[in-house]
Regions:
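Short glycine-/small-residue-rich flexible loop motifs, especially phosphate/cofactor-binding loops
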Residues: 9-12, 134, 161
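Glycine-rich phosphate-binding loop
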Residues: 156-175
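Short beta-strand segments
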Residues: 33-35, 76, 114-116, 174-175
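Noncatalytic linker/hinge segments flanking ATPase motor cores
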Residues: 63-65, 71-79, 116, 147-159
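Extended, charged alpha/beta regions that create polyanion-binding interfaces
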Residues: 2-106
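Glycine-rich phosphate/diphosphate-binding loop of Rossmann-like nucleotide-binding domains
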Residues: 92, 97-152, 156
Length: 175
């Protein structure tokens, strides 16, 4: 038999991967917290198998979600005060060798935006969408470093994309 805190620590080992750290164990519960901004992923099938073991649980954010440094990713706990070690061994076997959770850092750092449309290009209407795109990019740690206006002319748009690619931005967005 194991105390709930020891059991929670074993569950943490099942789930934790790099780019995250644990909270202190308290009353049989540990939380995992993101160390970086990135994409949070959960092996949902193996998590289901682990959670099928009685008297333990691991709750996570949804898989494939953007997270920020400091966000809580998961909480795990042993439900009774003491737990049969065989249940934790069963959970460890269900989890396999790889951790259940992963935070992958964002790889894209810079973006260029090409705003298309003859009305915007000629100044007949104001471009109100580019600031929205820029804010959305910033939420993922991506800086918009280039912005180009193009008419609806296909050759002009094609040339703008080629120029943007040559400039070395990580991401090109056409609106």
């Amino acid at each position: 038999m194991l105390h709930e805190d020891e059991g929670a620590e074993r569950l943490r080992k099942i789930a934790q991967n790099e780019n995250m750290h644990p909270s202190e164990v308290k009353e049989g519960k540990i939380e995992l917290i993101a160390d970086i901004d990135g994409l949070f992923q959960v092996d949902v099938g193996r998590l289901y198998d682990v959670n099928s073991v009685d008297e333990i649980m691991i709750a996570t954010r949804h898989t494939n979600m953007a997270v920020r440094k400091g966000d809580k990713l998961a909480g795990m706990r042993v439900i009774p005060l003491v737990i049969d070690e065989k249940k934790l061994e069963e959970a460890e076997k269900a989890a396999g060798k790889e951790p259940l959770l992963k935070v992958t850092p964002w790889k894209l750092k810079t973006a260029g935006v090409i705003t298309t449309g003859s009305e915007v290009y000629k100044g007949l209407i104001k471009d109100q969408f580019t600031p929205v795109v820029e804010k959305k990019l910033e939420a993922f740690g991506i800086q918009m470093i280039k912005h180009v206006l193009c008419s609806d002319d296909m050759e002009m748009i094609t040339q703008a994309i080629a120029d943007m690619k040559k400039s070395g931005v990580d991401l090109i967005i056409c609106t």
